């Protein structure tokens, strides 16, 4: 998501809800609730010449069964458009596609062939299958989104279209208590335009329309049992922005290349910075060096917690903290034609309950009621105002602000560089397996 912010900044998508439920239910029941054609047990008799049968003798008959008819409603083999087929129907074995596997380098190269490390890797199968399922959902949803997002659409249409697809493919519409905690949308869909780098998702009534000249960062997450896949890409229709996007994409790939067990976080940031600053982009006749946004970082990911505590800088730093075996990281980079530094601005949409929130008395009744809704529907997963609207909550802003002021809920306002600048983002989730590094969200697109 949702980049982690440093310095003074804080650390840290809906159509008719019924349509989402119907879509998910329809996909989930595909092959189960539709009437199935019965295999025929009728037999036909086929005359054959019997051995030693005399002329005019009776012909022996050989029984031949009809071929069984194909069952109506058999599990689909391909995803629908828009994506609405439950992913487990496409992978009935429960085995999901493996991400990009990258061998460890240097002193960790032995891990590739170590029998002990391969054994430990096999022990993580359930953990990995949940991550791979979430990653495949992310790939299928973004494939459709990238092909269908066009100028003229509202940001609300774009965000809710992505979120509806995620809910359908996970089979978790998120309207029943606890359903979204089992799986579904991991955090609000970010649709960040131009100088807005992160944490912008439309609130109710937002009429902002995507234009041809915009640069939009699309940052969305999928989770299965709290295993969060966090991946982001940037869309630009005008080719003059191509170098900006390429700089950030390659910087992210550099970060992935340098990441690994025992890799020092500060050194990863140095390599990312070198890659990004090697690019220039000409926009409207003016040339800019692409700058890393120095107070935005990648981060580790824990179960049901998008920011675990470790930060992966995108500029050189003295951080000697090492990555460790079994950890999961979001490697994300942001490039800008502006100051290369973001600040809080605009109306807030992103919120999350603080994991170790204080137990304090709440004088505002609506705050206690809202906290109960948050606990039962999101836990520590980030949410936005639209998600509360979708659950039928109203007149909740006073209570929400009270939870924020008491330190129970953290607000995450949009993060912006200077107005008139352009920013880009690319992000992948990686798993540091015992015997290799798996770029779990890697696809053919990025």
Curated annotation (Swiss-Prot):
InterPro entries: Creatinase/aminopeptidase-like (IPR036005), Met_Aminopeptidase_Type2 (IPR050247), Pept_M24 (IPR000994), Pept_M24_MAP (IPR001714), Pept_M24A_MAP2 (IPR002468), WH-like_DNA-bd_sf (IPR036388), WH_DNA-bd_sf (IPR036390). It is found in: Cytoplasm. The keyword Hydrolase applies. Its EC number is 3.4.11.18. A divalent metal cation 1 binds at residues 219, 230, 427. It comes from Sclerotinia sclerotiorum (strain ATCC 18683 / 1980 / Ss-1) (White mold). Residues 1-91 are annotated as: Disordered. This is Methionine aminopeptidase 2. Substrate binds at residues 199, 307. Its cofactor is Co(2+); Zn(2+); Mn(2+); Fe(2+). NCBIfam families: met_pdase_II. Cotranslationally removes the N-terminal methionine from nascent proteins. The N-terminal methionine is often cleaved when the second residue in the primary sequence is small and uncharged (Met-Ala-, Cys, Gly, Pro, Ser, Thr, or Val).
């Amino acid at each position: 998501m949702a980049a982690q912010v440093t310095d003074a900044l804080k650390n840290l998508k809906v159509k008719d809800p019924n349509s989402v439920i119907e879509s998910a239910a329809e996909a989930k029941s595909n092959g189960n609730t539709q009437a199935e054609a019965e295999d025929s047990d009728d037999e036909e008799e086929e005359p054959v010449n019997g051995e030693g049968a005399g002329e005019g003798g009776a012909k022996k008959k050989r029984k031949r069964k009809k071929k069984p008819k194909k069952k109506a409603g058999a599990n689909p083999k391909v995803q629908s458009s828009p994506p609405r087929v439950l992913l487990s129907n496409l992978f009935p074995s429960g085995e999901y596609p493996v991400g990009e596997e990258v061998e460890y380098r240097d002193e960790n190269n032995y891990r590739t062939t170590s029998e002990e490390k391969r054994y430990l890797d096999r022990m993580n199968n359930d953990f990995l299958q949940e991550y791979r399922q979430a990653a495949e959902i992310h790939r299928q949803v973004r494939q459709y989104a990238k092909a269908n997002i066009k100028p003229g659409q509202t940001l609300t249409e774009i965000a809710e279209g992505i979120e509806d697809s995620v809910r359908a493919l996970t089979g978790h519409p998120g309207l029943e208590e606890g359903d979204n905690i089992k799986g579904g949308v991991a955090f609000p869909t970010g649709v960040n335009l131009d100088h807005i780098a992160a944490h912008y998702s439309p609130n109710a009534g937002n009429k902002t329309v995507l234009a041809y000249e915009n640069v939009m960062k699309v940052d969305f997450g999928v989770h299965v049992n709290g295993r969060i896949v966090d991946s982001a890409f940037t869309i630009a229709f005008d080719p003059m922005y191509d170098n900006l996007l390429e700089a950030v994409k390659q910087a992210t790939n550099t970060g992935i290349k340098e990441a690994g067990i025992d890799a020092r976080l500060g050194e990863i940031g140095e390599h990312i910075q070198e890659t990004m600053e090697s690019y220039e982009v000409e926009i409207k006749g003016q040339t800019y060096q692409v700058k890393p946004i120095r107070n935005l970082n990648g981060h580790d990911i824990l179960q049901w917690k998008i920011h675990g505590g470790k930060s992966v800088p995108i500029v050189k730093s003295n951080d000697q903290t090492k990555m460790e075996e079994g950890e999961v990281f979001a490697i994300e980079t942001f490039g800008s034609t502006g100051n290369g530094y973001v600040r809080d601005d605009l109306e807030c949409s992103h919120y999350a309950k603080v994991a170790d929130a204080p137990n304090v008395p709440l004088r505002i009744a609506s705050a206690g009621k809202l906290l109960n809704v948050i606990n039962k529907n999101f836990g520590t997963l980030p949410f936005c105002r639209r998600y509360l609207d979708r659950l039928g909550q109203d007149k909740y802003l006073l209570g929400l602000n009270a939870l924020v002021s008491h330190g129970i809920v953290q607000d995450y306002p949009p993060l912006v560089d200077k107005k008139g600048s352009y920013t880009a983002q690319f992000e992948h989730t990686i798993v540091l397996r015992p015997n290799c590094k798996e770029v779990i969200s890697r696809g053919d697109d990025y």
